Curated annotation (Swiss-Prot):
Binding partners and assembly: Monomer.
Role description: IF-3 binds to the 30S ribosomal subunit and shifts the equilibrium between 70S ribosomes and their 50S and 30S subunits in favor of the free subunits, thus enhancing the availability of 30S subunits on which protein synthesis initiation begins.
Gene that this sequence comes from: infC
Classification via InterPro entries: T_IF-3_C_sf (IPR036788), T_IF-3_N_sf (IPR036787), Translation_initiation_fac_3 (IPR001288), Translation_initiation_fac_3_C (IPR019815), Translation_initiation_fac_3_N (IPR019814)
Gene source species: Bartonella tribocorum (strain CIP 105476 / IBS 506)
Record PANTHER family: TRANSLATION INITIATION FACTOR IF-3, TRANSLATION INITIATION FACTOR IF-3, MITOCHONDRIAL
Listed GO biological process terms: ribosome disassembly
UniProt keyword terms in alphabetical order: Cytoplasm, Initiation factor, Protein biosynthesis
Protein name as it appears in the record: Translation initiation factor IF-3
């Protein structure tokens, strides 16, 4: 690689081959022409000669506005970045002896997160003597699993880590 290498396709005097396959500014194939002839046609049209397919034999070049081409490729790249959805992991914290209404509120939040396409980590925290009743926590997580089975799949089965039990669910 030379230190003067530029970003993007080669254009005008940077194209160092004797002959190119030329596509004019209307998109019509002109056939194989010499590089001097192609550069003259580009200058006559007031546009640039841009290498489109450098690996072809001879390379395919097109007469277009280089600034416009760079703008369109940047715009296309920005559009694809915008369309990408970043999946987040949302966390819902519950206790083993959660009340009916509180459970309903937490379940509604889980449904909302799943509908938005995010993963949900359900964390069940045990305090003091609650560690002796881990079966209650497991039953609660099984209940969450059953209540969300239509819209979500289990990504990480319920497991105990220290004083808390956790489970991760993801959209189907």
């Amino acid at each position: 690689m030379t230190p003067t290498q530029k970003d993007g396709p080669r254009s005008n005097q940077d194209i160092r081959v004797p002959h190119v396959q030329l596509i004019n500014d209307e998109g019509q194939h002109q056939g194989v022409v010499s590089i001097q002839e192609a550069l003259a046609m580009a200058a006559e049209a007031g546009l640039d000669l841009v290498e489109i397919v450098p690996n072809a034999e001879p390379p395919v070049c097109k007469i277009i506005d280089l600034g416009k081409l760079k703008y369109q490729t940047q715009k296309k790249a920005a559009e694809t970045r915008k369309k990408q959805k970043v999946i987040e992991i949302k966390e819902i914290k519950v206790r083993p002896n959660v009340d009916v209404h509180d459970y309903g509120v937490k379940l509604k939040a889980i449904h909302r997160f799943i509908d938005h396409g995010d993963k949900v980590k359900i964390t069940l925290r045990f305090r003091g003597r609650e560690m002796a009743h881990q079966d209650l926590g497991l039953k609660l997580l099984q209940r969450v699993k059953e209540d969300t089975s239509e819209i979500a799949k289990i990504e990480l089965e319920p497991k105990l880590e220290g004083r808390q039990m956790m489970m991760v669910i993801a959209p189907k």
